[in-house]
Amino acid sequence: MKLYIDQKNNVVTMHEASEDMKCFEEFENSKPYTFDTVKEVKGLENPVHILLNTSMIDEKWIYMNLKKYISKQDRVCILPFSFFDDTKNEVDWNKQYAPGQGIWYRSNQDVFHKYGICDEQIVWVNYFKDTIDEMKMKILNSSILMLTGGAPDLMMKRIKEKKLKKIIKNYKGIMIGYSAGAMIQLDLYHISPDEDYPKFSYQNGLGCLSGFDIEPHFRKSKIQMESIEKVKEEKGISIYGIYEDGGMIIDKGITCFGKLLFCKWVVSDKLLQAVL
């Protein structure tokens, strides 16, 4: 079903659209738009959640949407727990995340400079080096928590292992997650089959957000569309397919920017009759 956008950037279905509205599929704009038909997330415990595919929040299309949430006074904590099992010790960890040598260091650290945040305001949680108390203090003393991309199931496993789930779920600052870091913010998420995960699966997340699911790195592939339909049918929730240049902001309601596909779950007539 095609979606249409009115002058206030509200998205409606083709049945509700007027002649002067633009079709969502033809609408090339990075301005935020909202889904009026999506109910507010129940049990929202955190002020703001940001769901992305990339850490590059200094790119113009992301910056223009996040700049009102991030200020130069903020303190950032980066939680890189999403590495795969081939990272076995601190030496391996340093090759990915340490200053001066980590391949993912600058793409998580330097991106905050555009918002006026300097290096002294950014800390990293080191899975292999920090004690649990040190990890908790770094998280609690921050106003922005960055959850990195990679393996969502392994990230949740490590969060539980280090007894961090409760303080992350109840985090009162801005939570930014990309790819795996976006997925685990949900109470329940799915993993579509790909080169890293051969089988479809449901996984439990942090439980910060509920009432919907996401398909990150969305390309509208056959496998992704099959996964989306499976989730809609089995879980009875709507799914957002987030293209590489798309993102979501959950701040009391759901606001989307860039390119997404909204797959709404609709109760079938048969099911509705059964309920009645």
Spell out what each predicted region is:
Residues M1-N46:
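The feature marks helicase ATPase cores and/or their adjacent C-terminal helical subdomains
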Residues D6-Q7, T13-A17, F35, V38, L51-M56, C77, I144-T148, ...:
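Structural motif
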Residues N46, Q73, N141-S143, Y171-K172, ...:
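Short, well-ordered alpha-helix to beta-strand connector turns
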Residues P47-K72, I78-G102, Y189-L276:
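C-terminal and late-domain segments of enzyme folds
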Residues S107-D119:
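Short helix-loop-beta junction
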Residues I117-M175:
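Flexible gly/pro-rich beta->alpha loop and the following alpha-helix that scaffold active-site loops
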Residues L147-T148, L154-R158, L164-K220:
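Class I SAM-dependent methyltransferase SAM-binding "motif I" and its flanking Rossmann-like core
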